[in-house]
Amino acid sequence: MRPILCYTLLLLVVGCKTPAHFSAFEAPSNDRAWEPSLAVLSRADVDQDHVKLYNVRRCHYVTEDVYTTEYRDREFSLDDVQTVDFIVVPFKDFPSLAHTMLSFGMADGSQIGVSVEARLEKHETYSVAKGALKQFELIYVIADEQDLITLRTQHRDTDVYVYRAQATTAQVQALFLDVLQRVNQLGQQPEFYNTLANNCTTNLAMHINALKPDTIPYGMQLLLPGHSDKLGYRLALLDTSVPFETLRARALVTAKANAANGSANFSRRIRQ
């Protein structure tokens, strides 16, 4: 069965089991009893080329559900934002689906990760079907890259692929500012997450299209983001100097991330 048909059937079959508390008229809110790792929203102040970023998350995981969370603020010049990487995390049991993220490279060698997610309440679990039924709000998690990657490689046992985007420094900085604008917007005007229309990959595509309209078309490879890296390659948003399969093999950082977990040089080591 073709993946898109499987995905559609999954939504139809599981989605028929509408939760008892579901209401089509409920408004999105930032005021709920959130999972601790999703309880604090980031925000940003931008004054010309000066950026202050509040509440950058760093979770220290014992297991996926046992962790300590700390937040710190960062101040830097926009000129310090130099590169951006596209990160793909295929679902273990259905690799045509995936979580996607961005990671911005800074002049000091650090990385600022951006993960667009369903914002879960305490004791709530994610499901594709519930995500289509206004059961989750949307959150932009701004975090230490090690937090975002090792959560997935070590504690969710999923592969992670990190691709350097082909973009000028000016384009990277414009993308970063557009992301921060969205972060601030959601702090004031919460939205529902939607599995098909307002998810990790559609939001990242929206940011890119805001800078250059129609760069990324809405289609199957957005609905099935496990193939979004191949779409990025076809659109020359990733390095096309080598065959895609070679690039993909180089982008796999799972083993490196597990080996470098806890290292102060985590971001450098996974890119070596």
Where are these regions (language model features)?
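Sec-dependent signal peptide recognition
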Residues: 2-7
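Short secondary-structure subsegments characteristic of cysteine-rich extracellular domains
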Residues: 10, 78-81, 226-231
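C-terminal motif of bacterial Sec signal peptides marking the signal peptidase cleavage site
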Residues: 13-15
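Regulatory N- and C-terminal appendages and interdomain linkers associated
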Residues: 17-20
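Membrane-interface segments at or immediately adjacent to transmembrane helices
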Residues: 22-74
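Glycine-rich catalytic cores of cysteine/serine-nucleophile enzymes that process amide/ester linkages
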Residues: 51, 56-160
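Charged, low-complexity helical/coil segments in non-catalytic cytosolic or luminal regions
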Residues: 145-148, 152-177, 187
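Activation targets extended, charge/polar-rich intrinsically disordered C-terminal tails
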Residues: 178-272
